[in-house]
Amino acid sequence: MAGICCGVVGETEPAAPVDSTSRASLRRRLDLLPSIKIVADSAVAPPLENCRKRQKRETVVLSTLPGNLDLDSNVRSENKKARSAVTNSNSVTEAESFFSDVPKIGTTSVCGRRRDMEDAVSIHPSFLQRNSENHHFYGVFDGHGCSHVAEKCRERLHDIVKKEVEVMASDEWTETMVKSFQKMDKEVSQRECNLVVNGATRSMKNSCRCELQSPQCDAVGSTAVVSVVTPEKIIVSNCGDSRAVLCRNGVAIPLSVDHKPDRPDELIRIQQAGGRVIYWDGARVLGVLAMSRAIGDNYLKPYVIPDPEVTVTDRTDEDECLILASDGLWDVVPNETACGVARMCLRGAGAGDDSDAAHNACSDAALLLTKLALARQSSDNVSVVVVDLRKRRNNQASS
Amino acid sequence: MESSKQKRCRSSVVETIEAPLPLVWSILRSFDKPQAYQRFVKSCTMRSGGGGGKGGEGKGSVRDVTLVSGFPADFSTERLEELDDESHVMVVSIIGGNHRLVNYKSKTKVVASPEDMAKKTVVVESYVVDVPEGTSEEDTIFFVDNIIRYNLTSLAKLTKKMMK
């Protein structure tokens, strides 16, 4: 980490140009800071101060995914398979082989200043083969009320999506993802807080307190920002206020739009459903929930719905990386800044010649972004996934 | 003096519950266990037991309530002003917290429903509270009524489950 920081500080890179057409740009609350300043903030890691009286100070608990070790070995294994396939197959063209590798990724999830960890991250490279193409699944889920809805999304959503995509006609991604999210929502609703049903084994590692106090079950929900990456496309499905941002040639392109209750079209939808948005520590549905869409939260239906907004983006040679993160990051770090940080880390690893270096660069980017969020007094859990979208050369050295 | 400048508002929420009065009252009156039926309460610890009575039951008892994440507040400090097991009346004041509810005082009264004295209970929760700065009286009442209604709906579900 120190090495990366030292290397980056030496660079004199101009700030990433602002995309004036980006809605996120118009909404950003912080000025774009010089990249060196950003790194300095993170490198120094100033002591976390409890500026906000409403938040209790908690020790920052940094935790990578419990399955991270498996994830590493899976990625390595998939790389070997991919290279083997390329080597043995005469039908694969050079262009296609560029995209056949599993993308390198980095991810971090930290509790931050919140009392509990309610975020969850789901990484499933090569979770689906379709039309001879490898599909990869990445998801970030920011729970509220309790953690079990986000945990359930982490466990199940990729499998639900896989089953829906397998029966998908042509490329109807929007319909398929909406159906998947609705099934996920139904699934979390039907299971009474993971209580044992018909002798079925409890899937949760640790029982959450909702089992003991069922009235709270209805008030639990989660955001879900999900990306399915194929050799040619990036499909993003978003429900809630987590976010996906594409870094393309230094420019931050939002692939999702936050579902805030005071977003004009969401406000109209809620009112037409008979609901109401009240400003109580921010805009909230019925004065209670600060987002207009979520998985779960049965008590707020039909005002809070689980339907995602879906974007399908063609991949290009200029794509650098994709960042999926919870609002613990985006509330304090603008899209452009996050893009700049990730770009610096990836550049430090070169053009992806070395697969291990690229993987480390993504991990460094995710970690650096997380530290930046904490340094900027984020008051929430922070979860970040960085996906390397750059093309990889055929002559990639064996690791 | 300062509070006299603040605009106040008041409202009442009425809920009929399909359960006998003794059962409903036994849950409502447990000042130390609001999480049993209050939807947004995560946990509760007693700060002081007050004079007389058992823990959590004496007049003047104070509880520290931790609220669930996602809710527009993290904690609330509440005092039991009155608890009458004969007239089934409970009065609670909120004396602290980051929910913007200042000078909040609620009175909950439980009576057997005239419809079916043995099986139905009517819960009436009335309150007064300052209207927070920047918020309308209408929105304040809507917000608080909403929370109380959710709590009483949870209470109805809980008692229904307990009677099975």
Swiss-Prot record, chain A:
Q: What is this protein called?
A: Protein phosphatase 2C 37
Q: Which positions fall inside the PPM-type phosphatase domain?
A: 104-389
Q: Which reaction does it catalyse?
A: O-phospho-L-seryl-[protein] + H2O = L-seryl-[protein] + phosphate; O-phospho-L-threonyl-[protein] + H2O = L-threonyl-[protein] + phosphate
Q: Which family does it belong to?
A: Belongs to the PP2C family.
Q: Does the keyword Zinc apply?
A: yes
Assembly and partners? Interacts with AKT2/AKT3. Interacts with ABA-bounded PYR1, PYL1, PYL2, PYL3, PYL4, PYL9 and PYL12, and with free PYL2, PYL3, PYL4 and PYL13. Binds to and inactivates SLAC1 and SRK2E. The inactivation of SRK2E does not require phosphatase activity. Interacts with CBL1, CBL2, CBL3, CBL5, and CBL7, but not CBL4, CBL6, and CBL9. Interacts with RGLG1 and RGLG5. Interacts with KIN10.
Q: What is known of its domains?
A: The 'lock' site stabilizes the complex made of PP2C, ABA and PYR/PYL/RCAR receptor by keeping receptor 'gate' and 'latch' loops in closed positions.
Q: GO molecular function, one example? A: protein kinase binding
Which residues does the record give as Zn(2+) binding sites? Answer: C146, H148, C208, C210
| EC number(s) reported in the record | 3.1.3.16
Q: Which residues bind Mn(2+) 1?
A: D142, G143, D327, D331
- Which residues of this protein are annotated with the site description Lock? W280
Record-linked InterPro entries: PP2C, PP2C_BS, PPM-type-like_dom_sf, PPM-type_phosphatase-like_dom
**BP term (GO), one:** negative regulation of anion channel activity
Alphabetically ordered keywords of this record: Abscisic acid signaling pathway, Hydrolase, Magnesium, Manganese, Metal-binding, Protein phosphatase, Ubl conjugation, Zinc
State the conditions that upregulate or repress this gene.
Answer: Repressed by MYB44. Induced by cold stress, drought, high salt, and ABA.
The organism of origin for this protein: Arabidopsis thaliana
**UniProt cofactor note:** Binds 2 magnesium or manganese ions per subunit.
What switches its activity on or off, per the activity regulation note? Repressed by PYR/PYL/RCAR ABA receptors in an ABA-dependent manner.
Q: In which tissues is it expressed?
A: Mostly expressed in seeds and leaves, and, to a lower extent, in roots, stems, and flowers, particularly in siliques. Essentially found in the phloem.
Cofactor(s) recorded for this entry are: Mg(2+); Mn(2+)
The chain's disulfide connectivity reads none
From Swiss-Prot, chain B:
Motif residue range(s): Gate loop: 69-73
Protein's UniProt keywords contain ATP-binding: no
**Pfam families attached here?**
Polyketide_cyc2
- Start and end residues of each stretch annotated as START-like: 3-160
Q: Where is this site: Involved in ABA binding?
A: V144
Instruction: Return one Gene Ontology term, BP aspect.
Output: abscisic acid-activated signaling pathway
Short sequence motif Latch loop: positions: 99-101
Judging by the UniProt lineage, the source's domain of life is: Eukaryota
The record lists abscisate as bound by A73, D74, F75, S76, T77, E78, R100, L101, V102, N103, Y104, K105, S106, E125
Q: Where is the site described as Involved in interactions with PP2Cs found in this chain? A: P72, S136
Cystine pairs annotated here are: none
Keywords attached to this Swiss-Prot or TrEMBL record, sorted alphabetically, are: Abscisic acid signaling pathway, Cell membrane, Cytoplasm, Membrane, Nucleus, Protein phosphatase inhibitor, Receptor
Q: Name one GO cellular component term.
A: cytoplasm
Broad class of where this protein is predominantly found: cytoplasm
- Tell me yes or no: is Membrane among this UniProt entry's keywords: yes
Domains (record comment): Upon interaction with ABA, the 'latch' and 'gate' loops change in conformation leading to a tight dimerization and the creation a surface that enables the receptor to dock into and inhibit the PP2C active site.
Role this protein plays = Receptor for abscisic acid (ABA) required for ABA-mediated responses such as stomatal closure and germination inhibition. Inhibits the activity of group-A protein phosphatases type 2C (PP2Cs), selectively PP2CA, in an ABA-independent manner.
Q: Which family does it belong to?
A: Belongs to the PYR/PYL/RCAR abscisic acid intracellular receptor family.
Q: What is the protein name stated in its UniProt record?
A: Abscisic acid receptor PYL13
Give the species.
Arabidopsis thaliana
